[in-house]
């Protein structure tokens, strides 16, 4: 029996991509994935996940990784959950090896609804099991989670090569906020790698507007930057 798992990494960050990974593994290889320590994906360090990536891929029948960048996220129609459903379906339908069962890490508060919305749009027949914290419960989802996290980590490292220290990309990361504030001060706008629909950016803009008004006596950011 072929089992699929699908998960995302980077849903919440203010910059960088959201990455979706879908994997297909033969039921007989699940114990081998467990032996690698895949089930404890959240306890793994980034370096350990990176080392596991190739070992996991060798045990898979197929896998697909989608990188969804800020421009695509910001231009979506509908909610973030609907966007996730759409791209979970895209990833699963892109698999060349079709699974008999699909395990899904549900983003919706109603697990069954999330699974039903995906099942309705698949181009193949499969049993769907959608649950919260599926990456802790089902090995195929744990494997997908690791692939997604590694792919996002790699994308962030490439961005660091281009922009310098940007932190993890999460709004709660002081390094990320510092990068965004300093970039805005220097350029008068945020870099193209940010999700412009995130409230974090609005808060930073408001903070800097007050700062600039106080320091320069300007009435607006537009005046300050000569726009």
From Swiss-Prot:
* Domain RNase H type-2 residues, every copy: 1-210
Q: Does the keyword Aminoacyl-tRNA synthetase apply?
A: no
EC code(s) of this entry? 3.1.26.4
Q: How is the cofactor bound?
A: Manganese or magnesium. Binds 1 divalent metal ion per monomer in the absence of substrate. May bind a second metal ion after substrate binding.
Which cofactors? Mn(2+); Mg(2+)
Q: Which family does it belong to?
A: Belongs to the RNase HII family.
Which HAMAP family did the record assign? RNase_HII_A (MF_00052_A)
- Catalytic activity reported: Endonucleolytic cleavage to 5'-phosphomonoester
Q: Give the GO cellular component terms, alphabetically.
A: cytoplasm; ribonuclease H2 complex
Database matches in Pfam families: RNase_HII
* Function as written in the Swiss-Prot or TrEMBL entry: Endonuclease that specifically degrades the RNA of RNA-DNA hybrids.
CDD domains per UniProt: RNase_HII_archaea_like
The protein's UniProt keywords, in alphabetical order, are: Cytoplasm, Endonuclease, Hydrolase, Manganese, Metal-binding, Nuclease
An example molecular function term from Gene Ontology annotations: RNA binding
Q: Which PROSITE patterns does this one have?
A: RNASE_H_2
> Cross-referenced InterPro entries, in alphabetical order?
RNase_H2_suA (IPR004649), RNase_HII/HIII (IPR001352), RNase_HII/HIII_dom (IPR024567), RNase_HII_arc (IPR020787), RNase_HII_hlx-loop-hlx_cap_dom (IPR023160), RNaseH-like_sf (IPR012337), RNaseH_sf (IPR036397)
Q: Which PANTHER family match?
A: RIBONUCLEASE, RIBONUCLEASE H2 SUBUNIT A
Protein location = Cytoplasm
GO terms in the biological process aspect are: DNA replication, removal of RNA primer; mismatch repair
Q: Which SUPFAM superfamilies match?
A: Ribonuclease H-like
Q: Where does a divalent metal cation bind?
A: 7-8, 105
Protein name, entry field: Ribonuclease HII
């Amino acid at each position: 029996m072929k089992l699929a798992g699908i998960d995302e990494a980077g849903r919440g960050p203010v910059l960088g991509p959201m990455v979706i990974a879908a994997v297909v593994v033969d039921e007989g290889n699940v114990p081998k994935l467990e032996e690698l320590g895949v089930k404890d994906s959240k306890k793994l360090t980034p370096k350990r996940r990176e080392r596991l990536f190739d070992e996991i891929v060798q045990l898979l029948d197929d896998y697909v990784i989608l990188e969804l960048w800020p421009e695509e996220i910001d231009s979506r129609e509908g909610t973030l959950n609907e966007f996730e459903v759409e791209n979970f379906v895209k990833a699963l339908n892109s698999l060349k090896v079709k699974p008999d069962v699909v395990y899904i890490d549900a983003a919706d508060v109603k697990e069954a609804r999330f699974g039903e919305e995906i099942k309705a749009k698949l181009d193949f027949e499969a049993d769907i099991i959608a649950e919260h914290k599926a990456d802790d419960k089902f090995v195929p989802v744990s494997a997908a989670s690791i692939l997604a996290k590694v792919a996002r980590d790699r994308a962030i490292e490439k961005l660091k090569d281009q922009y310098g220290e940007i932190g993890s990309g999460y709004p709660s990361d002081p390094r990320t906020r510092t990068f965004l504030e300093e970039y805005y001060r220097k350029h008068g706008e945020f870099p193209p790698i940010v999700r412009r629909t995130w409230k974090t950016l609005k808060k930073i803009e408001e903070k800097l507007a007050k700062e600039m008004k106080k320091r320069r006596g300007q009435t607006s950011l537009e005046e300050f930057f000569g726009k």
